[in-house]
Amino acid sequence: MKASYLVLIFISIFSMAQASSLSSYIVTFPKTDNMATDQNSIIEDVKKYVVDIGGKITHEYSLIKGFTVDLPDSDQILDGLKERLSYIESEYGAKCNLEKDSEVHALNRDHLVA
């Protein structure tokens, strides 16, 4: 009985540690007229690359071409994604934007009424 509690606690701690080691990023693809290939195939290629490097697509946008991804906190992984997006931009003329996802407010929090 005590061993099962110990295993449950270990799994919980491992899960929390693993979840805290992810960062969320937004990847968008503005419409470009001078592209050498189909934009949708480029987006699918980037999504496949993200999954291959250990990322997870958490949301796909419908109003704009893009998605949100959770990536492991690693400079090497982030640099690899940046290099891939840069290559796609130079090779196919597809503009790619990558930004860290963060909370945004219309007003300074000091103006909020309690």
Curated annotation (Swiss-Prot):
UniProt lineage: Eukaryota, Fungi, Dikarya, Ascomycota, Saccharomycotina
Protein name, as recorded: Uncharacterized protein YHR138C
Remaining remarks: Present with 319 molecules/cell in log phase SD medium.
Molecular-function annotations in GO: endopeptidase inhibitor activity
Location of Phosphoserine modifications: 41
Keyword check for Mitochondrion: no
Single Gene Ontology BP annotation: vacuole fusion, non-autophagic
Family: Belongs to the protease inhibitor I9 family.
Alphabetical keyword list: Phosphoprotein, Signal
Signal sequence coordinates: 1-19
Species for this entry: Saccharomyces cerevisiae (strain ATCC 204508 / S288c) (Baker's yeast)
InterPro entries reported in the protein's UniProt record: PBI_I9, S8pro/Inhibitor_I9_sf
